[in-house]
Amino acid sequence: MELNFYTNKVKLEMEKAVQTYSNQIAKISAGKANPKLISGIKFIYYDEPMSIEEMAAISVPEAQQILIKPYDIKTTKNIIESLNKMNYDMQIVDEGAQVRLKFPALTTERRKELVKQLVKLNESAKVAIRQVRQDENKLIKKDEELSEDEQKKYLDEIQKLTDKYIFKIEELNKDKEKELMTI
C-alpha cells in the first residue's frame, strides 16, 4: 500500500486525539468564566436531549460569571438540573428568566489539584496517540507488499507524525498549565 494510505489514516486519528484533549482541558476552569465549560451539556426538552448552547444565549458579564438566558423560560429548571449533575466548582444561581454561574477565585491548593488533573489528561492523550502509532505499525509490518526498506521508511514516517502530535499535546498542556497557575 502507499505511504499516504497509512499517513492519512494516522493523521486523522491523531488529530482526533488532540481535539479530544483540547476539548477536555477547555473544561478545566482556571477561575475565569469560560463558555466552553458548559458546551456539550445536555438537558431534556420535550423528550429530546438538547444542548444548552442550542437553547440559550450564553455570555460572560464578568470575569468569574457565565450568564445563561434560555430562549424558552420554561427550560430554566431543566438547565439547572443538568448543571447540578456536572461536577464543576461553581455556584448556580436561578434568577427566574436566566441562570448565573459564579466561579470562585482559585486558591493555590486548588490550582495544584487542577494541574494534577491536567497531567492525567495529558498522559492519556499521549497514550492515545501512541496507540494509534502502535496499531499502524502492526499493519505496516503485516503488509507483505512492502519491502524491508519501504517498511522502515513507513515506520519512520509514522514516528515523525507521532512526535509531531505529541508536541501539539505538550504545547496545549503548557498553555493550560500557565493559565491555571496565573493568578
Swiss-Prot record:
GO CC, alphabetical: cytoplasm
InterPro entries documented for this protein: Ribosome_recyc_fac, Ribosome_recyc_fac_dom, RRF_sf
Encoding gene (name): frr
Taxonomic source organism: Mycoplasma mobile (strain ATCC 43663 / 163K / NCTC 11711) (Mesomycoplasma mobile)
HAMAP family the UniProt entry points to: RRF
Family: Belongs to the RRF family.
Superkingdom to which the source organism belongs: Bacteria
SUPFAM superfamilies referenced in this protein's UniProt entry, alphabetically: Ribosome recycling factor, RRF
Annotated function: Responsible for the release of ribosomes from messenger RNA at the termination of protein biosynthesis. May increase the efficiency of translation by recycling ribosomes from one round of translation to another.
Example GO biological process: translational termination
GO MF, one annotated term: ribosomal large subunit binding
UniProt-annotated location(s): Cytoplasm
A UniProt-annotated Pfam family: RRF
Swiss-Prot/TrEMBL keywords: Cytoplasm, Protein biosynthesis
Protein name according to UniProt: Ribosome-recycling factor
